[in-house]
């Protein structure tokens, strides 16, 4: 009586088919993953700026002083990061409340129509350096997607976010 011992394992053909299927699934998943990561960074950056704007407004009301939310480096704009600073009566920096570094290489923060900074007076309203009312937005563009988000300041100085699925006909920041 001859005993046959069955050997377990995969054949080369089965292994190649499995690897091919995994490669196809990875090729489909990677672009979606990149888009997901970029959109997450976009949402995170806009939420952080909105939170900092709300905190700056609250600090201005609480301390009865002017509080400014401005880019870290004025020449490069909001893409370099931003800081929240309390100003004294002469307009000099009194105290830095918060400072944020750039969040991602994929994001472009631009098309700012608030004059390069957000200035809250002691009543919590947005004003420019001469005391005139300002409203507007700071636009965020994600590099790998067509999605646009903006921080929009309303007439009372309250910040809100707006997201548009397309850079064309974006109603967020016109």
Annotate each language-model stretch with its function.
Residues 9-31:
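Short, contiguous hydrophobic alpha-helices characteristic of membrane insertion segments
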